């Protein structure tokens, strides 16, 4: 049986949240997540739900107390079920997604079997310490499990003027941050593009949710 393209039209407006799910070790990816959340919250009828994942121990078990000492709560599978859209973020690890986020994504096979995420829009974002540190390969890698889930990829179009002029982060595949370019945090271009991605994702999520 074919599934409908819309995310979940039965959701009440009050529960139409876009999940911003990320892993951040030094805070750069978290800052990007917060900027995307600001863009989501700027769209009437949408709200951002910020969630993170715990680090992994050498034995590849997630190792952390049930509640993080600061910042966003740890994600649960129900966060993915309940959202109408997803922004997924990770710092680059040798051109790939960081292990803690990959570990969490590997636990979503039950959602995949149920088709729980099929038809929901999703965006990706990343941060690196250098300009050519693997941003685009990391963004593309993060898209793969989302496509297996049947999610609809939402990127950044070149109608966003900063995308053509940025000297730091920002790609058509998703928002990004180059840490060494702006040591004080996100550059103005990175900030604008992250917020633009949040607005675009939220707008499309609401349209698909009906």
Describe every region a protein language model picked out.
Residues 1-12:
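Short, basic, low-complexity termini and linkers enriched in Ser/Thr/Gly/Pro
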Residues 2, 23-24, 159, 174:
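Compositionally biased, intrinsically disordered low-complexity regions enriched in proline and serine
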Residues 118-168:
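Short, glycine-/small-residue-rich phosphate/pyrophosphate-handling segment
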Residues 11-116, 170, 177-210:
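N-terminal beta1-alpha1-beta2 submodule of the flavodoxin-like/Rossmannoid cofactor-binding fold
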């Amino acid at each position: 049986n074919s599934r409908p393209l819309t995310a979940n039209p039965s959701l009440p407006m009050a529960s139409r949240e876009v999940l911003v799910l990320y892993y951040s070790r030094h805070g750069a990816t978290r800052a990007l997540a917060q900027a995307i959340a600001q863009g989501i919250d700027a769209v009437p009828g949408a709200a951002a739900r910020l969630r993170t994942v715990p680090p992994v121990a050498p034995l590849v078990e997630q190792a952390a107390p049930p509640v993080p000492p600061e910042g966003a709560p740890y994600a649960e599978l129900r966060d993915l079920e309940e959202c109408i859209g997803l922004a997924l973020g990770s710092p680059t690890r040798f051109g790939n997604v960081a292990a803690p986020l990959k570990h969490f994504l590997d636990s979503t096979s039950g959602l995949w079997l149920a088709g729980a995420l099929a038809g929901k829009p999703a965006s990706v974002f990343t941060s690196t310490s250098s300009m050519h540190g693997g941003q685009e390969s990391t963004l593309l890698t993060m898209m793969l499990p989302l496509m297996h889930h049947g999610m609809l990829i939402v990127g950044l179009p070149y109608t966003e003027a900063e995308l053509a002029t940025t000297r730091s982060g920002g790609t058509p595949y998703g928002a990004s941050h180059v840490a060494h370019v702006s040591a004080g945090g996100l550059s103005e271009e990175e900030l604008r593009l992250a917020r633009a991605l949040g607005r675009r994702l939220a707008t499309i999520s609401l349209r698909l949710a009906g």
